[in-house]
Amino acid sequence: MALAPLGAQASTAPAPHRINLHAAFGRALRAAPVNGRVAGVVPPVGRRITAARPAAATTCTEPNCNLTYGGGAVESAPRVYLLLWGPNWTPADPVSNDLSKLYSGLGSSSDSWSTVTNQYGPAFSGSVFMGTFNDIATPPAVVGYSDLSAEADAFATSQGIAGDVNAQVVIASQSGTCFDTSDGGFAGSCGSPGSGAYCAWHSYDGLVAFTNLPYMLDAGAICGENWINRGSNGLTDGVSIIAGHEYAETATDPEPPSGWVDNADTISGGEVGDKCAWGGTIWGGHDAQGNVTLATGTFAMQSLWSNAAGRCILTTSPVVSITRPRNQQTILNHRVLLRIHASTNSGFKVTFRASHLPTGLHIGPAGLITGKATRLGRWVVTVTATTYGAHKSTSFIWKVIR
């Protein structure tokens, strides 16, 4: 079918293409089968999903069980197609702009977030983004699974990607879309925050892997608005966090639950993003989350589960920063208490060690120097902060006087 640009858009976000799938595939849309399984459900902040399966027998203790491979498909080279559904999308919309920029940056050489999934099979040699498309047909009055499946199938057919195991169709519905409540419903259904059970999910219907990504700003804070950043800078935090969650899970488990899943985990959902959602708060944890810088901008993101690390990590290129304390002067035999501060983007705990401390002083693994200096002198102290795959040192002078 003919594709035409929707209109000018920010230079850093590719311009969408206008299509009308309902005009071209109306019969197929009405007859779409419902044979998929919803997975990777991102619940609203503070809520849990309903267990979809019994827990598998395991010798590990949750939430620290690793993902296991179920023998099914895995995307070796993910390709993302962003499908904006509805006539009300505009070039200036913050959600569509954020999504286009996010997907354009994922897979690029500066992306050390997607590469957490390398251990499960996906590989990245450039941007995963295949473009933004706008289906200008109005969504049904109430959108259900069969509608989303039909939309994904029609798009896949129009683009020649039906049956492509590496293809992801992300269906981003326009603001105000109402969703069926038989699966719990979207937390911002019909344009306002509510008691819905999900923020997004992904599935496979036998033809193509697709994501149901409603208009996240309709749900507000319960789907991540200002989750990481304050004010206007955090408006689309939930958009990038949740879109990234579903993207990583579709890459590692495109035909759920046959890919990489922790089958013992019935609390979070058990996929690579589920175990770390909202900082792991579903499990009562404090997993890594924060801003991730890609070639196309900086985005709020959650961490992903790493079997190699045995926990949630935010990046495969960890960086540690350590704050140099001012030079110290201590009176002989007086008690010392000095905290060394460091941070990391990896999501791992930072531990400390020190060399050449004044006699009688020692540093704990959390960076607290304590004790009583028992010898006069001048020392050049070096403190090193270490995390998984990275370390950083700083030095300062410490004098012990009478």
Report the location of each language-model feature.
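Proline-enriched interdomain boundary motifs that mark the N-terminal boundary
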Residues: 317-324
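N-terminal zymogen propeptides
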Residues: 3-66, 106-116, 125
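Metalloprotease/metallohydrolase-associated module, dominated by Zn2+-dependent proteases
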Residues: 191-237, 253-317
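Strand-loop-strand motifs at the edges of beta-sheets in extracellular beta-sandwich domains
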Residues: 359-374
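Acidic, Ser/Thr
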Residues: 340-345
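C-terminal edge beta-strand
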Residues: 392-401
